[in-house]
Amino acid sequence: MVQPRPAAPTVKFVDEYCQWYKSLFPDVRSFEAFKYLHVGCISDLKRKTLPEIAKIVGLDNQQGLHHFLTTSPWDIEKLRTLRLELILQVLKGRPIILIIDETGDKKKGSKTDYVKRQYIGNLGKTDNGIVAVTVYGVFCGMTFPLLFEVYKPRERLQAGDKYRTKPEIAAILIKKLQSMGFKFNLVLADSLYGESGKNFISVLDELNLNYIVAIRSNHYVEILPRQHIQYLKWQKFQRVFSDLSRENRFIREIIPGKRGELRYWQITTDPENLPDNTTWYVMSKYPDITPREVGNFYGLRTWVEYGLKQSKNELGWSDFRLTHYPDIEAMVGNYLQCLFNGVCIRSNCFSLHHNESQNLFHILGGIMEMAGRTFLTIFV
């Protein structure tokens, strides 16, 4: 029997990380394409398109990479499962903070599946594009992607699709992660989810999860007759950022009627003028939480929305010109999330361990044990 040739080597840390997924690929060429895409996306290419990646890894053209993404018979669900199993093995049962975020990308025209003129959070405006509900984990200062699902607008549904709101999608993803064995000590989300009592907040309550969510300034809370709203004194705290720099912020509790399990907060940079763009209203369900903890925990969600977007773009998150949902799911969702985790390993193992030949789990374990030295950024 003729033995298949070994896959061509690339960068050592890419080869080591990709070995975890080797069993998914039916032939050597598919596995090589998997590795080549890793190398191309972590390179300094300005645009991480398939033609440019093919050039930088020494291929004659992009056909092999395109075939890998669109027709090669590797299983998307198995890739996702292996990636999550790797994270679970490193966590060893320890809980994580869960962040719900929407990742949107601007798209021209209407050929791309599920494209629509809609609000794209990371752009801060309404534009033509696609939006995915994404769930991230935070552990000891490291941020990493877990699951995603593209939001399918009602008017763009295809045969067999079922319409789900973004809060409904987020609730399904949380349940899926919990069923796999992930444990959460806190869930963070913006006001779209904080104002979705039936489809999101009720699910968190059902799962007995702690949460801090943004709410609108006119959020409705029912109080009894003769009860009134109390605004407690402002407390100053220091917001600690990803680079460990600090900034003074102010927080006060708002008590509608009588303090209960749900607590309400106002956070701002200027308690005198309450500027709209730096004043937030927050609802928490977290026993014995302090005002400072509310302010800094909620800031983690802002980091994902703004800081992590830059990191994803460095990996070419929005550079791939794919129009069909299965291809988008394979590349932008699952493959790039797999790549994201791989770069997490690289950016930290060089600072923690100088011997690249160490076992993958040992490297990952070392990353997780950083105990909050700094937030993870893609390139250190």
UniProtKB/Swiss-Prot annotation:
Keywords annotated in UniProt: DNA recombination, DNA-binding, Transposable element, Transposition
Gene Ontology biological-process entries: DNA recombination; transposition
Domain of life: Bacteria
Keyword hit for Iron: no
Pfam family, one: DDE_5
Keyword DNA-binding listed: yes
GO molecular function, one term: DNA binding
InterPro entries with a match to the protein in the record: IS701-like (IPR039365), IS701-like_DDE_dom (IPR038721), RNaseH-like_sf (IPR012337)
Function (record text): Involved in the transposition of the insertion sequence.
Listed PANTHER family: TRANSPOSASE
Protein name (database record): Probable transposase for insertion sequence element IS701
Organism: Microchaete diplosiphon
Lineage: Bacteria, Bacillati, Cyanobacteriota, Cyanophyceae, Nostocales
